[in-house]
């Protein structure tokens, strides 16, 4: 891809970056990958939240412009000009969120890596403490919490206060000791860059809902984890066109199904590796969560025999080919539908419709 704009002194393809080349002696503790596609309304807040004097020299921010056509590039360039030792821009053809993450991972120089979506931002004080924790280099993954922040009124909400009961914050745990007690989401995860690269599988490109792939693929290599009692990530909710809205999930349901298929294929690969039981159980539990989400999408569609048949066929395939994943589904609605021979699909759809109308 070529950039024809006199404001930019070079033309960039996939690999070249604007920003000072990172000196091998300038060790970066953390690389923050910011995938960007047409986010000029939000990107200044996102990047600005990372401009923190205490950590600027210790972090690298890779702004991956994924074929963005609005003014996002110009805003990002302002940060490169002011902080060339921290901010870098990577231009690439549009390939979706996963493609931007894959590209960022290739270019990352930090010991750890974190994904920050360009419509989200970080809490400055909490982010500083995260970087301080990472600098010790003690664990493969550092977990930190996040707020949901509603676009309409700025109110914050939490999904859960603690990752599990009786967690000891700051303690280094063996992953196998806590694998059955928690589930890590992308917004909470900061992981060693080398482990993220060693996953052996690229994140799906031209596809939504790949956050779970970023977590699940490298988790099989994770041995240690520290839980940090900080709300670092500010996750914006209610933005128009947001992929996690139910309307968008219906529209992109095939993307969601593709992610599920990719995770099942990865699970097959890991079984042949004779993965230890704790990691295998974690994979099964994580994929089961995606199965539950897919049921939710089916239930949100207008009621039809076609949707009923699709839901039933997929679930029966999982029961026959992935029985351990099937059994790890915890959602009570899914199990009620299963036990009814899928006949509760119809009242389930009705309840889902009412819930969506109230939202």
Task: State what each model feature region is.
Residues 2, 12, 299-359:
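Membrane-interface aromatic/basic loop that binds lipid-linked glycans or pyrophosphate carriers
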Residues 232-239, 245-274, 293, 297-322:
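Catalytic core of nucleotide-sugar-dependent glycosyltransferases
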Residues 58-68, 88-93, 118:
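Short beta-strand/loop segment that forms part of the nucleotide-sugar
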Residues 113:
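Short aromatic/hydrophobic "clamp" motif used to bind/position activated sugar donors
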Residues 92-108:
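Glycine-rich, basic loop-to-helix element that forms the pyrophosphate-binding segment
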Residues 97-98, 118-226, 233-250:
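Donor-binding/catalytic cores of nucleotide-activated saccharide
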Residues 49, 65-75, 96:
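A conserved acidic beta->alpha catalytic loop
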Residues 39-54:
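Short, well-formed alpha-helical segments that are part of the catalytic scaffolds
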């Amino acid at each position: 891809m070529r950039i024809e704009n006199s404001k930019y002194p070079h033309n960039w393809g996939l690999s070249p970056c604007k920003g000072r080349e990172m000196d091998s002696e300038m060790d970066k503790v953390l690389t923050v990958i910011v995938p960007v596609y047409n986010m000029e309304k939000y990107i200044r807040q996102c990047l600005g939240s990372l401009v923190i004097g205490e950590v600027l020299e210790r972090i690298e921010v890779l702004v991956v412009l994924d074929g963005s056509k609005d003014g996002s590039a110009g805003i990002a360039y302002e940060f490169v000009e002011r902080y060339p030792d921290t901010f870098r821009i990577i231009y690439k053809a549009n390939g979706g969120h996963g493609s931007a993450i894959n590209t960022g991972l290739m270019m990352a120089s930090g010991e750890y890596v974190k994904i920050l979506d360009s419509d989200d931002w970080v809490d400055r004080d909490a982010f500083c403490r995260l970087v301080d924790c990472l600098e010790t280099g003690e664990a493969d993954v550092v977990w930190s919490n996040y707020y949901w922040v509603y676009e309409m009124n700025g109110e914050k909400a939490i999904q859960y206060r603690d990752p599990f009961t009786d967690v000891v914050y700051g303690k280094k745990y063996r992953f196998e000791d806590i694998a059955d007690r928690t589930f890590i989401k992308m917004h909470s995860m900061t992981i060693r860059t080398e482990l993220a690269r060693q996953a052996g599988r690229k994140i799906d490109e031209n596809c939504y809902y790949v956050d779970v792939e970023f977590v699940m693929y490298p988790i099989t290599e994770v041995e240690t984890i520290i839980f940090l009692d900080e709300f670092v990530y500010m996750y914006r909710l209610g933005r128009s066109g947001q992929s996690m809205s139910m309307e968008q999930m219906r529209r992109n349901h095939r993307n969601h199904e593709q992610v599920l298929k990719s995770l099942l294929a990865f699970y097959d690969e890991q079984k042949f590796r004779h993965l230890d039981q704790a990691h295998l159980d974690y994979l099964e539990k994580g994929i089961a969560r995606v199965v539950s989400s897919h049921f939710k999408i089916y239930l949100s569609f207008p009621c039809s025999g076609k949707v009923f048949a699709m839901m039933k066929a997929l679930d029966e395939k999982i029961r026959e080919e992935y029985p351990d994943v099937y059994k790890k589904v915890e959602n009570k609605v899914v199990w009620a539908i299963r036990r009814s021979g899928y006949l509760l699909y119809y009242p389930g759809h009705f309840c889902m419709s009412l819930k969506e109308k109230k939202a």
